[in-house]
């Protein structure tokens, strides 16, 4: 388990793009499971959509990417730097995510090449139901 201070020490994201509230499992270089509490106070709900707020799919994918970032953030052999999106594959959205939901995000490292390019498989669930899944690629920016 990681505290919020530890999460902030590992990820560069800050409000309003810090999308990991709590880490319940962290195995550097292998996998991580984290929680994102979805609240009506988040800025995206002002316009997505008035009267029927839905969490934008791109933010669910970003939350999965941040959990993936936690997997590589403490790997001792990797150079320090900023890992950014390099691509996404086979992302599917299964059901809407609304304020009041709690996303449980699981990611596992699939590959890491030349200490610069990697791929993770991610899933986001609400109350055990799959809401989003896909593969996310990242690369190290010097």
Curated annotation (Swiss-Prot):
InterPro entries associated with the record: FabA_FabZ, FabZ, HotDog_dom_sf
Superkingdom of the source species: Bacteria
Protein's cellular compartments: Cytoplasm
Residues spanning the membrane: none
Enzyme Commission designation: 4.2.1.59
Primary location recorded for the protein, binned into one broad class: cytoplasm
Biological process according to GO: fatty acid biosynthetic process; lipid A biosynthetic process
SUPFAM superfamilies registered for this protein in UniProt: Thioesterase/thiol ester dehydrase-isomerase (SSF54637)
Pfam family membership, one: FabA
GO cellular component terms, A-Z: cytoplasm; membrane
GO terms for MF: (3R)-hydroxyacyl-[acyl-carrier-protein] dehydratase activity
Keyword vocabulary terms for this entry: Cytoplasm, Lipid A biosynthesis, Lipid biosynthesis, Lipid metabolism, Lyase
Active-site residues annotated for this sequence: 48
Top-level enzyme category: lyase
PANTHER family: 3-HYDROXYACYL-[ACYL-CARRIER-PROTEIN] DEHYDRATASE (PTHR30272:SF1)
Family in the record: Belongs to the thioester dehydratase family. FabZ subfamily.
Function field: Involved in unsaturated fatty acids biosynthesis. Catalyzes the dehydration of short chain beta-hydroxyacyl-ACPs and long chain saturated and unsaturated beta-hydroxyacyl-ACPs.
Protein name (database record): 3-hydroxyacyl-[acyl-carrier-protein] dehydratase FabZ
Organism for this UniProt entry: Prochlorococcus marinus (strain MIT 9313)
Gene name linked to the record: fabZ
């Amino acid at each position: 388990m990681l505290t919020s201070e530890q999460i902030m020490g590992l990820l560069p994201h800050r409000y309003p793009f810090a999308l990991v509230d709590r880490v319940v499992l962290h195995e550097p270089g292998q996998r991580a499971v984290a929680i994102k509490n979805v609240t009506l106070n988040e800025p995206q709900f002002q316009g997505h959509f008035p009267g029927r707020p839905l969490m934008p799919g791109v933010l669910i994918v970003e939350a999965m990417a941040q959990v993936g970032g936690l997997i590589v953030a403490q790997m001792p052999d990797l150079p320090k730097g900023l890992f950014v999106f390099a691509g996404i594959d086979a992302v599917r959205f299964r059901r809407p995510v609304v304020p009041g939901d709690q996303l449980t995000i699981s990611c596992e490292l699939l590959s890491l090449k030349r200490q610069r390019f990697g791929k993770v498989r991610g899933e986001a669930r609400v109350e055990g139901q799959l809401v989003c899944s896909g593969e996310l690629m990242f690369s190290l920016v010097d």
